[in-house]
Amino acid sequence: MSTKEKLISHVMKEEPVGSRSKVTVVGVGMVGMASAISVLLKDLCDELALVDVMEEKLKGEVMDLQHGSLFLKTHKIVADKDYSVTANSKVVVVTAGARQQEGESRLNLVQRNVNIFKFIIPNIVKYSPNCIIMVVSNPVDILTYVAWKLSGFPRHRVIGSGTNLDSARFRHLMGEKLNIHPSSCHGWIVGEHGDSSVPVWSGVNVAGVSLQGLNPKMGVEGDSENWKAVHKQVVDGAYEVIRLKGYTSWAIGMSVADLVESIIKNLHKVHPVSTLVQGMHGVKDEVFMSIPCVLGNSGLTDVIHMTLKAEEEKQLVTSAETLWGVQKELTL
């Protein structure tokens, strides 16, 4: 008898039980691994799968995570370059793609990453036909559109991480300026995750008190407190982190886990994520951008009708036109 047989007596033959909350992360770069560890530390899945074309790095990353299994509550952590390892995932987080270089706009990344998606998305669909795809790779809005087209999934099951992080940066910077915790500072960044994002100044509030009601010039030229600079810091934030450390990882990883939690736990929380906005707020083209959306177990269940000022709506349409200008040139 083996040591195991001497130690353990089976009471019953265990039937294989499928995963109820399996999460897959495609791409084990800095963002992928930050997303993976954030999901693990929030105890969001009963199985985590990692996929990448770089076999050595993939093997090293999964071993490193497995060695910490004692400190986690996720029973199974697996990895392979073959997409069969992702089978029956509830949520598939796509972080793979060419990395954004210092000074490079997210939109410049687009065609390189479209070609990568032509391989990734069909494989996800093959093994997890009922999953929710969450796109994180940049430019996220255009690549969410690409994933939607390539997958054939309904729009509620293809979500972009969008401006969830931009809004978190915005609230952090508001908190710094007011000396209040970010969770008590309420404000939304919508539109493109990137240079043409739109701060909804008319909705910024603390404890229900409209800050624009206190300072009507907030967010516009001539504001002595220069709140407009806060949005500029949001836009420049990622570029500055890339300049300083070479890449972004921790904040986007935590943002991904925040979104995954709302889906897995069916929280019905409202997040600014990238979805199809054609026909809303004056947007005519088939583009994906961030607006406040409700996330639950079925994916993106509802969109919130924002009350925007004319100037904010105009900026949102301009943001959509910026995305469409690039998107219409794509070869899918």
UniProtKB/Swiss-Prot annotation:
Enzymatic reactions: (S)-lactate + NAD(+) = pyruvate + NADH + H(+)
Signal peptide: none
Active-site residues annotated for this sequence: H193 (proton acceptor)
Chain positions recorded as NAD(+) binding sites: 29-57, 99, 138
EC number: 1.1.1.27
BP GO annotations: lactate metabolic process
Pathway: Fermentation; pyruvate fermentation to lactate; (S)-lactate from pyruvate: step 1/1
Enzyme class, UniProt record, top EC level: oxidoreductase
Places the protein is found: Cytoplasm
Positions with a binding annotation for substrate: R106, N138, R169, T248
Main location: cytoplasm
Gene Ontology molecular function terms on file: L-lactate dehydrogenase activity
Keywords in alphabetical order: Cytoplasm, NAD, Oxidoreductase
Cellular component terms (Gene Ontology): cytoplasm
Origin: domain of life: Eukaryota
CDD domains: LDH_1
Free-text function comment from the UniProt entry: Interconverts simultaneously and stereospecifically pyruvate and lactate with concomitant interconversion of NADH and NAD(+).
Family: Belongs to the LDH/MDH superfamily. LDH family.
Subunit comment: Homotetramer.
Protein name stated in the entry: L-lactate dehydrogenase A chain
UniProt gene name: ldha
